[in-house]
């Protein structure tokens, strides 16, 4: 099994439990950073990373801070930060650095993104927990077993009334049972219902080739080859009821040459997809 054959890195041993990640979002105003800094000083805190940005067109201020405090009690830290920033009415998230997000990976038959994510997670490149994998096909069960991760087969029968609804009901059960924080569609080839998209808003990440909507449907890379495209790309985005139009998280492209075949383009596309999805999941897992 891969989990035993490779040098597994225990995420919790490398992360101190009195280190925190804070994100804050609110209307821009004077004194926000001063208020946070004062609260951290009272907690005998030490800042390791700090990034902030004000969108001048919307007037929204966002900030991410990774810091250490004199306590491991997240509620004590949260209360101090909320008190210090109450005047600004912010939206705050706070967690200890070793409280890893629990990610459900969903896949159909293409396994390149799944394998890449599991490899990176097992080598400590992405700080996340993958407690379960779900699929509408059995093809990737062996990969889940190699990593000692439970595999849930959730079939969706085309043309059968109620099949999709039953599958999504089962997915909701899995999300609740495994206390899932986010879902990653690693080439999961089913469209989620509008209700599920709304209920999981901001918690579902998808990967697709950047040709949409120019090359829809089956065999997009063959369509691209026929049209003589010069760039192969991929986009990772949050899922919304509007198909493939959710907020973009990460993108990349690779240049292709005229002598490359449709199969070459598909191979390049798979490489770009797995890298872009891994970057997006890493950004999400680190609250960036």
Residues of each region from the PLM?
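Short hydrophobic alpha-helical segments enriched in small aliphatic residues
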Residues: 3-5
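Short, glycine-rich nucleotide/cofactor-binding loops
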Residues: 103-112
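A short alpha->loop->secondary-structure connector
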Residues: 121-129
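Histidine-anchored nucleotide/phosphate-binding helix
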Residues: 111-122
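Adenosine-nucleotide cofactor-binding segment
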Residues: 145, 149-178
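A conserved regulatory-domain signal marking ACT and ACT-like small-molecule sensing domains
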Residues: 9-101
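Short internal beta-strands
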Residues: 128-139
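Donor/substrate-binding cores of folate-linked one-carbon enzymes
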Residues: 137, 147, 163-166, 178-288
